[in-house]
């Protein structure tokens, strides 16, 4: 799932040329999950090993792909996106079934809804800071 970060004026916060942009080395995505066959007392943290910032040719904005562990064998509780050493955001979820996410909330604001998906296309998460 692609994550885009912009300022209210539209500046790209993942572009190194933007003042105050987030640094690739600081980015970390970690999800709290319950493993297959586990219970709520067996929560583990699963981190994306490497975040790569890429450029979206269509929009001209930079983004990174945050892999969300929503496979059948895991139940995702919430995800933390560290943007800098002093700034970490939280994603929470609603599920249509145990393994299908229907809504994603970013710091409690709805940012993704399966009802708005176009066929065969992932909807990006766009965060304005």
Where are these regions (language model features)?
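Extracytoplasmic cysteine-anchoring/structural motifs
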Residues: 4, 30, 34-129
């Amino acid at each position: 799932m692609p994550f885009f970060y912009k300022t209210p004026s539209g500046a790209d916060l993942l572009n190194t040329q933007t003042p105050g942009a987030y640094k690739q080395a600081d980015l970390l995505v970690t999800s709290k999950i319950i493993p297959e066959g586990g219970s709520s007392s067996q929560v583990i943290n699963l981190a994306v090993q490497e975040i790569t910032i890429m450029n979206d040719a269509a929009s001209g904005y930079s983004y990174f792909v945050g892999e969300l562990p929503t496979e059948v064998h895991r139940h995702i509780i919430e995800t933390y996106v560290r943007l800098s050493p002093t700034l970490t955001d939280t994603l929470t979820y609603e599920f249509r079934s145990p393994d299908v996410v229907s809504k994603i909330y970013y710091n409690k604001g709805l940012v993704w809804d399966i009802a708005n998906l176009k066929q065969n296309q992932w909807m990006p998460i766009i965060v304005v800071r």
